Amino acid sequence: MNYINKCLLFLLVSVSFVSIAQKKGDAKSLFEYQGRIEKIQDDKVVLIGSASSVSFDFKGNSCSISLQSVENHQNYVSLELDGKYIGRVRIEKGDVKSFPITVSNDNKTHHLSIYKATEAANGGVLFAGTSAKLVESATSKKKKKIELIGDSITCGFGNDASTIPCGSGEWYDQHNAYWAYGPILSRSLNIDFVLSSVSGYGMYRNWNDEHLDEAIIPDVYENLYLNRDNSKPYDFAFQPDLVSICLGTNDLSDGDGKKTRLPFNEEKYVSNYIAFIKTVYKHAPNTRIVLLTSPMVSGEKNVTLVKCLKKVILTFESDKKHKPIALFEFKSMSPKGCGYHPDIADDKVMAEQLIPFFKKILNEK
């Protein structure tokens, strides 16, 4: 049974686990969704991409949420209550389960956000309802929007070893996209965001594959689930004011040292990057694009990366239809997360570097 069929089956099971407002049929306006998600029915939703989320306001001190990992393994979400991070929750494989949320003993209105901590490659997380007494959210001011395209660094891979140490469990047990650099800076700037990122993927090849057996970001970007399945295209309804692209770490990687690895091909990297930017413009013609270097690339490799990115930018220099493409260079770091990836502290450093740069661009007329 595939995961969507499983979702539909368990939706029937969870009919009783809805709020009074949902039963009245007016819950459509009471849930807010962000990121790459798939709506099923009755405001049930599959969270797909890293940091994709569902949020709602509720009144009182009683709240439970119904979640399911729709793959045959555990998954994770991160929770934010009233603007404060309250932890990462492990969702074991199996049926829909209820997770209680501890709320202060008052009759105030609260805001809960549920973020997918893992990435698209780890399978979906089904949000199947809440027991809370939902109330309508106050009308929020229209926010600027940003899309962050990237690889494991953008996903938040290996940044949270607070419960399972690095090297233990599965490769996604330390994922926490809530604390990836993109969501951190987005919260700081009070902007809406979507992450379009896949661990291990590059612009023309992957960290250990020469684009022979595995996909690359340009192959999957237009597909909702960020995989080769093009039967469910991404609708691109989210129109970002700024698109950030951080790809190159895996293209420049030496692989695992066992599988054949060819020398880095600057021409392929640059030509693929140019074609990919044209794809981004096709779906978001009014956006401003920023190309990022990698905090995990240094020395001669970083010199090569910067040179290639400048070639890409130069190609679009005479393009009058779109806003100028910018370049941002991270300061190199020695990441302290799992698998030589940034940990949460490193992600905060990356976000702090980007915040003034992105703020200036977003405020430009």
Language model features with spans:
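Positively charged n-region of N-terminal signal peptides that target proteins for export
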Residues: M1-C7
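N-terminal secretory targeting modules
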Residues: C7-V13, S19-I149, I153-Q174, L362
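Conserved SGNH/GDSL esterase-like catalytic core that processes O-acyl groups on lipids
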Residues: S50-A51, E119-N122, P165-P263, E267, ...
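Surface-exposed acidic, glycine-flexible loop patches that form ligand/cofactor-binding
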Residues: E136-T139, N230-Q239, K278-A284, S318-D319, ...
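Structural recognition of the beta-strand scaffold that forms the well-ordered cores
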Residues: K145-I149, T154, F193-S197, D241-C246, ...
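A structural motif corresponding to the C-terminal end of an alpha-helix
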Residues: Y181-D192, F276-R288, T315-K323
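Extracellular serine-dependent O-acyl
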Residues: T287-T293, K301-C338, I344-K365
